[in-house]
Amino acid sequence: CLPLLWPPAVAPPPGGFWFTLLDAGQGLAAVVRTQHHVLVYDTGPKLGTTLDAGRAVLAPFLRQQGASRVDTLIVSHADIQHTSGVRSLRELMPVARILTSSPEQTPIDGAEACRAGQGWEWDGVRFQILHPPPAGFSDDNASCVLKVEGAAGRALLPGDIETAAETALTATYGTGLAAEILIAPHHGHRNLSTPAFLNAVQPRYVLFSTGYRNRFGYPRPETVARYQATGATLLNASDEGALTFRLEPGQALEPERYRREYRHYWTAP
């Protein structure tokens, strides 16, 4: 469901941020907006033979939100479900900085390596790269893991990390992983989201980014059961459309669900 008719926004207050997980098919595309800055985390998959999520989903959403540029683009790792919209997004608006886990494997001009320990602050909101370290991980386990923390809450974006990276993150950060909003690692793969990892994160909301009736069976039932056991609320963008959280002081943490808020007859169940 494309967010073309979403009502125009103003901007978060200082210390607040808006987090949106887009409905981008079997892949991932998310946007974090602070008062004066925009971050994009992954650019989604191809959508057929001639279209991709960068052109069809990300750019329209950003323009509707009043964004004229992307301050930082994080490409979590070299996987076409996460990278396919990069070129289109860069054609349609300026992108000031690009971080990715393996620049040598992701042919994106000007991309820099994301590494644990990197961080910055925009408008009172803290951005931290928690993973990967300089060596020891590859492929999905080398995904850039981003934590965003503002005055009203936190979001954890782990890309496609697998068990080895989950274990390392839990050992390194412990409860420092805590976040109200968690994007399920690797779309809800069956071997992920161990009890130790979930105990560290303690999410209130777990978000899945999967294709409708995808061939992988994501999210896997056994993984869903582990999340349900934590008491978290589980939401899937393929069911709900774009999911937006406005993390602002004094506001309840509740998702805006595109298909529920802006229902049309063609999106009715």
What do these predicted regions represent?
Residues 1-269:
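Non-globular, low-confidence helical/coil segments that flank catalytic cores
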